[in-house]
């Protein structure tokens, strides 16, 4: 039986309307056990200022972003279930959901799935990687009962 341990940190000022811990656990359980037996993930919900600072420091981008992924790298020869940390910016997620006409819950779920895949080693730097990652995201989101998060882009093509 797989086990995903969640450490949820609420570092944003306003907690009203945030998904609860059970929802975050469900979203992690929808993606990680497909790839590994045990994992521990920290999800830190932050405001724009912290997201902006981290995005500038680690990615050189001078703006807040929806989700940042920080994979844990164990020292050689040491096996640990720590997968890494997801930093999710509440305001960016809410703004994107509104701009993209997506249900807010579905967009939160997508950010957890997207960030988790980054922790598992997936990326979207080149087109082939992006296609593979987006395909996995879509498959996972559909399996959890949500729409394809990229449906609007596919219709526009």
From Swiss-Prot:
Gene3D superfamilies: Metalloproteases ('zincins'), catalytic domain. One of its GO terms (biological process) is rRNA processing. It holds the Pfam family YbeY. GO terms for cellular component: cytoplasm. SUPFAM superfamilies: Metalloproteases ('zincins'), catalytic domain (SSF55486). Coiled coil: none annotated. The keyword Nucleotide-binding does not apply. InterPro entries: MetalPrtase_cat_dom_sf_prd (IPR023091), YbeY (IPR002036), YbeY_CS (IPR020549). It is found in: Cytoplasm. Keywords: Cytoplasm, Endonuclease, Hydrolase, Metal-binding, Nuclease, Ribosome biogenesis, rRNA processing, Zinc. The keyword rRNA processing applies. One of its GO terms (molecular function) is RNA endonuclease activity. Single strand-specific metallo-endoribonuclease involved in late-stage 70S ribosome quality control and in maturation of the 3' terminus of the 16S rRNA. Belongs to the endoribonuclease YbeY family. This is Endoribonuclease YbeY. It comes from Salmonella paratyphi B (strain ATCC BAA-1250 / SPB7). The lineage of its organism: Bacteria, Pseudomonadati, Pseudomonadota, Gammaproteobacteria, Enterobacterales. The gene is ybeY.
